[in-house]
Design a protein with these regions (language model features):
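Conserved "HGTGT" condensation-loop signature of ketosynthase/thiolase-family condensing enzymes
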Residues: 1-147
């Protein structure tokens, strides 16, 4: 594809976000504009042995607000964030999916690295408890593109 001659237009119709400074676009934006960093003492991970004890954690997130319990259980937390943000984006897009060509819709989603808690859990089971099997959901839960 020659990008010089690529004349397709892209229109952003919906956005969603789950972050340490907001779990909706409006809350995220307001906190960003007000200069709130979302950085605080880490509470969700054990920081013993590490000099850094601060970070940006997502708190008060309930996946059951966005999906049923069975779905949530099959997903790593970062994938749950992606679903929640996607649902907000779909809602804010206000598109009638019955009247548009679905092949013309795309999604841009960013994640750094997902599923690290699942990797840690399975490593502990295998190497410290000498368990010879891993969860069948391990691979789907740890892959970044599962978000």
């Amino acid at each position: 594809m020659n990008l010089k001659n690529y004349n397709e237009r892209v229109v952003v119709t919906g956005m969603g976000v789950i972050s340490c400074i907001g779990q909706t676009v409006n809350k995220f934006w307001n906190n960003l504009v007000e200069g709130n960093s979302g950085i605080s003492k880490l509470t969700q991970v054990n920081t013993d042995g590490y000099s850094c004890k601060i970070g940006g954690e997502i708190t008060n997130f309930d996946p059951n607000d966005y999906m049923d319990k069975k779905e949530a259980k099959r997903m790593a937390r970062f994938s749950q964030f992606a679903v929640a943000a996607s649902l907000e984006a779909i809602s804010s897009a206000d598109l009638d999916f019955n009247k548009i060509d679905l092949d013309q819709i795309g999604v841009f989603l960013g994640t750094g690295s997902g599923g690290l808690p699942e990797t840690e859990k399975e490593d502990l089971l295998m190497f410290q408890k000498n368990k010879n099997t891993i969860s069948p959901l391990y691979v789907p839960k740890m892959l970044p593109n599962m978000a």
